[in-house]
Amino acid sequence: MPFHIGSGCLPAIISNRRIYRIAWSDTPPEMSSWEKMKEFFCSTHQAEALECIWTICHPPAGTTREDVVSRFELLRTLAYDGWEENIHSGLHGENYFCILDEDSQEILSVTLDDVGNYTVNCQGYSETHHLTMATEPGVERTDITYNLTSDIDAAAYLEELKQNPIINNKIMNPVGQCESLMTPVSNFMNEKGFDNIRYRGIFIWDKPTEEIPTNHFAVVGNKEGKDYVFDVSAHQFENRGMSNLNGPLILSADEWVCKYRMATRRKLIYYTDFSNSSIAANAYDALPRELESESMAGKVFVTSPRWFNTFKKQKYSLIGKM
């Protein structure tokens, strides 16, 4: 069966010359990995196997553990007899999946955790996707209609923050204030017993050709073993296509992800957590950049709209002139 990428079509038999083309410096890691595992599959199965590898490395929203198991089992089915033993589900625990080379060295792996993180490790490159809080098929996710979690006394925390006139002014007029709020909010969280404070840099892209994505910052801290996000200027996006972000947010880490995911289906949102606010501000500054040249290593995806998946397929397509 042909492998469709964009408007192209990859024949089942992949020529050596075409494979050589993927050795460019900007070759995505999964394509480099493919060179190491393509001999596991006969020529008539290579296209389907390559499509499966691409899906493993770029999981669609709503992917579950069962989907991952199914994809690795498909690869085992497509592989030559003997080589299927190099494709593992549950080698180091039920949420660990990997493909090994002939020397039993890891080529590619996927690790799942209990909070919906799906981490792909591939040729020294790591990319994390935040998929869903529901890990079992048929479990529906709940829309987060509230802004303040009930797990902690978030309402009281917000009111106390507002007692500071400088912080209150920024909360009341949130546009462009998120960076300057990081330090006072983190100080407040420290005073309230939160530890492992991190500074979350966030990019929001409307389209792949956007010159300057929207940047945003929030503060993350841990209390009694659970992460919480203080995003007290989130409501600056209420009139920018994300109407349910209608107030300051103090939510658990999972609730925060769900809140943003429910806010938009067409924007690309990803983040990185830093131990230092200055590093966060520099890494996620509001300067021109190209999505095409952005490294996704170490970033956690909150949303992955269809246009982004199309963009990645076009960018990483093997289709070209022979």
Swiss-Prot record:
Coiled-coil positions: none
Major localization listed first in the record, in broad terms: secreted
Consequence recorded when altering C178A: Loss of activity. No change in IQGAP1 binding
Species of the source: Salmonella typhimurium (strain LT2 / SGSC1412 / ATCC 700720)
UniProt xrefs under Gene3D superfamilies: Secreted effector protein SifA, Secreted effector protein ssei
Keywords, alphabetical: Host cytoplasm, Secreted, Virulence
Protein name (database record): Secreted effector protein SseI
Subunit composition and interactions: Interacts with host IQGAP1 and host TRIP6 (thyroid receptor-interacting protein 6).
A cellular component annotation (GO) from this entry: host cell cytoplasm
Subcellular location: Secreted; Host cytoplasm
Pfam families, alphabetized: Tox-PLDMTX
Biological role: Effector proteins function to alter host cell physiology and promote bacterial survival in host tissues. This protein is required to maintain a long-term chronic systemic infection in mice. It inhibits normal cell migration of primary macrophages and dendritic cells, by a mechanism that involves interaction with the host factor IQGAP1, an important regulator of the cytoskeleton and cell migration. Also accelerates the systemic spread of infection from the gastrointestinal tract to the bloodstream, probably by interacting with host TRIP6.
Key word Secreted present: yes
